[in-house]
Amino acid sequence: AKRDAAKCDAAKCDAERIRMQNLVDWMKRRMDKCLPGMMISLSIQFFTLPLVAYYYYEIPVYAILLNIPVLALIPYVLGLAVFGSLTGQIAFLQPLSFALCRVCGWVLHGYRWLCDASLLLPGARMITGKPSEVRVVVYYGLLGAFYYVLWCGMKKKQRQMCTKGAQAEKQEWIRRRFGFGLGLVLVLLLTFLFVRGKPEFELDILDVGQGDAIYLCASDGTNFMIDGGSTDVKKVGTYRILPFLKAKAIRKVDYWFVSHTDEDHISGLVEVMESGYAVGTLVLAEAQKEDEKAYRLAELAQKNGIRVCYMKAGDVLGTRKEDVVNERNRAETFRIECLYPTNNNDSEDVNDRCLVLYYEDENFSAFFGGDISSEVEEQLVSAGKCRQTDVLKASHHGSKYSNSDVLLHALHPRLTIASAGKKNRYGHPSPEAIARVGESGSTFYSTIDYGRIRVRFVDGEMVAEPYRKCL
């Protein structure tokens, strides 16, 4: 009885092993049939990836998987479409033509639905930044070399295989070589397209027309934005601010400061938050906490998982003293101090309740005054809060009622940069303000003439790099 039971168990094990082997064989046959489609899909992705990254600054992560069913269905869809077009020329076959074309439409709409649905999945887009032309050329050269070597190997292997099992052996050889080559190409892709060096200090005054949008990369790599809006550039967040951030491969803005809630300072920020782009903390002036616009902005931020905090005069954001452990680390320290307003400021003019910020690190300093008037500027100077500055972001877009002599002489900026729109109705930047800046010895730049203006250090020297030359 025991021997019979043992034989029965052995038979069951053999049957189970056979079933598993059949399943494995079936899966291998399926993989062999899918392999050509997967190779074509991967080849298309590898070929188009640099161009997509170069022009859109991000890549769709799930595109490779989505292309597999498309490649499988395309021959049938094209065949049905051609046959439907031909039958449509014959009167009594037009109902058939309509039905065939309707089926093709369903397939295409289904694929579009899959594409839209894939973008809702976590990690659907990967921000890569804009690769340099050199990296793109090197990438294509290496990719071409890889495919040439693979093609030569396949031809050689094909000549060697003359036995009955040649086709299966060829499939196995392709699978192994393509898998190895795929890994190699991925390494090259990461190396030549997406690997970037350590972030360096950079200040950018974006060209957003009649508005403000300022990007600041601190000396330790922390990403800041100050304001983000416009009254004359439509969809400024979608078509100016987000493309700028993505082109620089910035996947998250750590802190987004809002000087005040006028449309020319927040319209783009609202679009950015609604798009789902990652923002760590939204920073508002505590004196504006009860304003309706500020309340709605904070509510939108919290709805999108963004932390909201409020600053008042005397608050400081930056590197803690205990975090400074050596001289190398000291060079990466920074501080952003709120100079104005106090938490009990009750000025009726929202411009005079603007968040005024002063950035400072080992080599650079900048003053950001929002839209404050000359009266507030004089208050800050009288309180001893203004000291020598490398860059002054011109207050109120270069208005003649701001950027006073008192402030300019206290800050003594090397550069003064105004953000304004062409032919704006306010006359910004005003000739009076430009004249005062010139008299103070500061070099004046305007986004009207120069477009985006970048300030960075080259060989230890601060330089201003306008996007275009002044005509």
Predicted regions and their residues:
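Membrane-embedded alpha-helical bundles of multi-pass enzymes
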Residues: 1-4, 17-82, 124-128
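Non-globular, low-confidence helical/coil segments that flank catalytic cores
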Residues: 2-22, 67, 86-471
